């Protein structure tokens, strides 16, 4: 132990978190630098990063502080938010998060650190939870199939619009929108429709009867609470070849007829009130359900049931050929990250309460609403009828009512000068009903009114069909039962709490506990997104400070935090480019150049903006072909809108010519969009806004430590140079069609000078600040790391990737390297030659890694037949070596196949992964020993992950699409079948 005297400042150790976040210690870093042949992190960085893009100065951010100091600072920020009683509704409702779900899902790294379930065998637990979610949504809506979540209700409605356009027989270009949809939904529909030349017509359902359109969107119950009978309208729309989309409320559907029963083709909504807090607008899991005929055009992830190699039921992502990572510019949507963690919470809420419990919650909510309506009517107040939980109170002095409400700590919905909305929910109490009645000069004897008041649900639209009949929704109603069920699912999966997840282009880094703690504070979770501005002063400060941090890290001039996924950030950036060109009288600029190596969301987002995608080449070294970009920029000079590139490239290298590429595009009037998916290789080292890029999206769920949640939530901020800043998404809703006029009046913190109030771009998310309640995670990360810590994190990410590439070089070729033979923060291992010599392909290696307890690297992207590895800075040398040892052992097994020591077909790679059931069976039929199957390295005998299923049959799953809970009898032993 060192006895060297230390100063008090040294002993205070303000940078302690940096050492917790970065995996290798200084001694390990020195050893790893020796392996890669460089004397220091700075020397390695200089050898990798082109000199003409490197930042000349450190980030102008404060120094690192400790976890305790950061938590105290953010607690002070949170205290500026005011938690009031909210009855605003408009798609957001109070709910009780069951504590067993809060602790064991939302606060559990086994759930929140998992990745999207591309590797089915290690994702069975969360896929079961998601298929429960799909069953919940399909059952309640009366549809045949539902997806595994979308970003929010408004974007889901926009996806329904484009699904209807693709699928309807009608040749019309008009989409009819119910004038009582939620205002944020209408606003987002306007954003999405305009670039696609879709005409929106807004009106009453009666007017829709006469409209010629390819589809109709109805709100049921509507935004003001009314429950309409739309069966005749559905028949009329179908007669014209159109489709009927419905935005709905899952809790209401426990009591009123399912949309599928009266003619809906597509149903969307938000599952937020199933146990997920307001969170100032997000994140929440939206959903889409549809008729079976449209399943192959439905956006978003879809969990299906297949079988494994032993013939047992197994879950997998199904119908993936619909998705952006495969179809690219022909994709049905640009949706990638969705809201898996929140969908899991909602599904567990339904499992915990079951159908009877949900009905009880719904009936109680409705009874309170009916009692309040009766009290108001008794005082001469005009209240709408045929409602579930929302009252439209008319012919009043709305300003006076709001003033009384605010004085009482109550928030009501602002509609106009003579009307307010009151939405009740699971959290509403008898005392709330009394207090609400008093605002209008009414008294409420709750028991007397309860005895005298009939329900307000329309008799002709009462639900008569059963729902959630599967045993999973009727078994786990005690806390012990649910606790053990959730634990059993978590045990089936591999997440970051067990192992590194070396997925290239995914940046699976530490999601520190201290970063996660503020997310569950009510000061962040209990703020309604439409609450009066003075109640969200803490959010205002948080958002200002985080935007400033991101501006400094990127070199851009302005940031929007509204996009609630990377794909939405891309879309926002491309919309800003489109609007900029139009403001200059250059609406004809519609060509978007995209390299063939780009992420699939890039071309999908471009086509959603009405752009024409032109693909550019890559050279033999994996670099963007600069000559091809120059040639195509010149060819399309008059029409060039943008170039989309990823930097460092998706091939894992820092390309030398990025500045020249930007100059070439600008010379022909185009804008440069730099995909920020690989920003983890840049923070503190280089800034895209300084080398010529005009716009980027970032992934806070990658670079800035928001966890992936098994496939969401995410945040995809859009960062731009000053000339594009006016075209960022506005943070408010325009008044129109008699609906509520504002979300913070277009910028709740305009006093800060951040420019929110001057932004005129269309909204890309339902809430003004997207998934606001998880922004504290990134704020905490930057605050605890400080300027020097962020730079060191980037440098260690570069080191870890090069360490893996160097140590694996005798066994696997790294497909692409940059100058000095180095990679960026990830490397592509070329295993294609091995398939020729042994019959073993990338998928076999991916599955065999499961036997070693690892999630596979990214499979066959960006180059088919390869593995892309990104270790991140958070992985220690020990964990890197463990992965390297596994890969070397796999290469030895392949060599044994090449040498004839293992059979070309009956070998541990072809049959991986191996389950405990298989290796412990009384009969073992394989030509290789059980021990090799189960324990290919001695260390695995100390700690072993057993996959719950053998290799999943993808072909069977796509031929036999089943996307609901597996019938219990499917689990019977073969001998009993």
UniProtKB/Swiss-Prot annotation:
It catalyses: N(6)-[(R)-lipoyl]-L-lysyl-[glycine-cleavage complex H protein] + glycine + H(+) = N(6)-[(R)-S(8)-aminomethyldihydrolipoyl]-L-lysyl-[glycine-cleavage complex H protein] + CO2. It comes from the Bacteria. GO terms for molecular function: glycine binding; glycine dehydrogenase (decarboxylating) activity; pyridoxal phosphate binding. Keywords: Oxidoreductase, Pyridoxal phosphate. Its EC number is 1.4.4.2. It is an enzyme of class 1 (oxidoreductase). Gene3D superfamilies: Aspartate Aminotransferase, domain 1 (3.90.1150.10), Type I PLP-dependent aspartate aminotransferase-like (Major domain) (3.40.640.10). Its cofactor is pyridoxal 5'-phosphate. GO terms for cellular component: cytosol; glycine cleavage complex. The modification N6-(pyridoxal phosphate)lysine is found at residue 702. One of its GO terms (biological process) is glycine decarboxylation via glycine cleavage system. It holds the Pfam family GcvP2_C. The glycine cleavage system catalyzes the degradation of glycine. The P protein binds the alpha-amino group of glycine through its pyridoxal phosphate cofactor; CO(2) is released and the remaining methylamine moiety is then transferred to the lipoamide cofactor of the H protein. NCBIfam families: gcvP, PRK04366.1. The glycine cleavage system is composed of four proteins: P, T, L and H. Belongs to the GcvP family. This is Glycine dehydrogenase (decarboxylating). It comes from Xanthomonas axonopodis pv. citri (strain 306). The gene is gcvP.
């Amino acid at each position: 132990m060192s006895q060297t005297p230390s100063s008090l400042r040294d002993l205070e150790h303000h940078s302690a978190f940096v050492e917790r976040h970065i995996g290798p210690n200084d001694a390990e870093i020195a050893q790893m630098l020796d392996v890669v042949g460089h004397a220091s992190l700075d020397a390695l960085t200089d050898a990798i990063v082109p000199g003409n893009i490197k930042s000349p100065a450190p980030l102008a951010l404060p120094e690192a502080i400790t976890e305790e100091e950061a938590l105290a600072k953010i607690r002070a920020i949170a205290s500026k938010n005011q938690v009031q009683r909210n009855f605003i509704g408009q798609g957001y409702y109070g709910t009780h998060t069951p504590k067993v779900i809060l602790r064991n899902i939302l606060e559990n790294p086994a759930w929140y650190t998992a990745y999207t379930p591309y590797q089915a065998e290690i994702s069975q637990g969360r896929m079961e939870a998601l298929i429960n979610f799909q069953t919940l949504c399909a059952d309640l809506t009366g549809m045949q199939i539902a997806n595994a979540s979308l970003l929010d209700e408004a974007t889901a409605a926009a996806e329904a619009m484009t699904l209807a356009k693709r699928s309807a027989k009608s040749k019309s270009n008009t989409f009819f929108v119910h004038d009582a949809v939620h205002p944020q939904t209408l606003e987002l529909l306007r954003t999405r429709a305009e670039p696609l030349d879709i005409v929106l017509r807004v009106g009453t359902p009666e007017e829709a009867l006469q409209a010629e359109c390819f589809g109709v969107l109805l709100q049921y119950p509507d935004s003001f609470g009314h429950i309409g009978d739309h069966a005749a309208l559905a028949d009329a729309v179908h007669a014209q070849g159109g489709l009927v989309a419905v935005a709905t409320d899952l809790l209401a559907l426990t009591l009123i007829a399912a949309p599928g029963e009266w003619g809906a083709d597509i149903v969307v909504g938000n599952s937020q009130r199933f146990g997920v807090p307001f969170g100032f607008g997000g994140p929440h899991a939206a959903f889409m359900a549809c008729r079976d005929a449209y399943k192959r055009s439905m956006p978003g992830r879809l969990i299906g049931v297949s079988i494994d190699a032993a013939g047992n039921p197994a879950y997998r992502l199904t119908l993936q050929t619909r998705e952006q990572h495969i179809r690219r510019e022909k994709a049905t949507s640009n949706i990638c990250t969705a809201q898996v963690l929140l969908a899991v919470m909602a599904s567990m809420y339904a499992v915990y309460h079951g159908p009877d419990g949900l009905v009880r919650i719904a009936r109680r909510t409705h009874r309170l609403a009916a009692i309040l309506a009766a009290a108001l009517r008794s005082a001469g107040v005009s209240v709408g009828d045929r409602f579930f939980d929302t009252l439209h109170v008319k012919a009043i002095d709305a300003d006076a009512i709001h003033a009384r409400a605010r004085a009482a700590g109550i928030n009501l919905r602002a509609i106009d000068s003579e009307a307010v909305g009151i939405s009740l929910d699971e959290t509403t109490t008898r005392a709330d009903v009394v207090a609400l009645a008093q605002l209008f000069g009414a008294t409420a004897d709750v028991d007397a009114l309860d005895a005298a008041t009939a329900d307000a649900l329309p008799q002709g639209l009462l639900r008569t069909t059963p729902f959630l009949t599967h045993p999973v929704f009727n078994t786990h109603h005690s806390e012990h039962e649910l606790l053990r069920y959730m634990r059993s699912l978590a045990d089936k999966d591999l997440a970051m709490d067990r192992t590194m997840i070396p997925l290239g282009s995914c940046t699976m880094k530490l999601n520190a506990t201290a970063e996660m703690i503020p997310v569950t504070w009510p000061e962040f979770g209990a703020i309604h997104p439409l609450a009066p501005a003075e109640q969200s002063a803490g959010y205002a400060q948080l958002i200002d400070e985080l935007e400033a941090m991101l501006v400094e890290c990127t070199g851009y001039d302005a940031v929007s935090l509204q996009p609630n996924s990377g794909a939405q950030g891309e879309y926002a950036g491309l919309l800003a480019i489109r609007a900029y060109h139009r403001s200059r009288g250059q609406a004809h600029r519609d060509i978007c150049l995209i390299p063939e190596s780009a992420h699939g969301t890039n071309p999908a987002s471009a086509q959603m903006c009405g752009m024409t995608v032109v693909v550019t080449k890559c050279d033999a070294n994996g670099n963007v072909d600069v000559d091809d970009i120059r040639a195509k920029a010149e060819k399309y000079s008059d029409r060039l809108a943008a170039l989309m590139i990823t930097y460092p490239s998706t091939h894992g290298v820092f390309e030398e010519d990025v500045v020249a590429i930007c100059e070439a595009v600008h010379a022909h009037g185009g804008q440069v969009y730099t995909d920020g998916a690989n920003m983890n290789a840049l923070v503190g080292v280089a800034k895209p806004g300084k080398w010529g890029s005009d716009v980027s999206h970032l992934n806070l769920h990658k670079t800035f430590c928001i966890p992936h949640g098994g496939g969401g939530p995410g945040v995809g901020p859009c960062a731009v140079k000053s000339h594009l800043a006016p075209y960022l998404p506005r943070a408010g809703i325009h008044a129109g069609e008699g609906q509520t006029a504002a979300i913070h009046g277009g910028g709740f913190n305009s006093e800060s000078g951040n420019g929110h109030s001057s932004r005129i771009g269309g909204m890309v998310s339902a809430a003004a600040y997207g998934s606001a309640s998880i922004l504290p995670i990134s704020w905490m990360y930057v605050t605890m790391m400080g300027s020097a810590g962020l730079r060191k994190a980037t440098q260690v990410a570069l080191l870890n990737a090069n360490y893996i590439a160097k140590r694996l070089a005798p066994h696997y070729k790294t497909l692409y390297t940059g100058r000095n033979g180095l990679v960026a923060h990830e490397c592509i291992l070329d295993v294609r030659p091995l398939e020729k010599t042994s019959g073993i392909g990338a998928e076999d290696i991916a599955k065999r890694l499961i036997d070693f307890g690892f999630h596979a690297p990214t499979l066959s992207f960006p180059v088919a037949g390869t593995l892309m590895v990104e270790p991140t800075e958070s992985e220690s040398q020990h964990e890197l070596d463990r992965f390297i040892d596994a890969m070397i052992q796999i290469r030895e097994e392949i060599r044994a196949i090449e040498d004839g020591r293992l059979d070309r077909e009956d070998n541990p790679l072809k049959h991986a992964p191996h389950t405990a059931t298989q290796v412990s069976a009384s009969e073992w039929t394989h030509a290789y020993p059980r021990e090799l199957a189960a324990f290919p390295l001695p260390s695995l005998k100390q700690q072993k992950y057993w996959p719950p299923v053998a290799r999943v049959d993808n072909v069977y799953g796509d031929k036999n699409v089943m996307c609901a809970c597996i019938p219990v009898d499917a689990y019977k032993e073969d001998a009993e079948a």
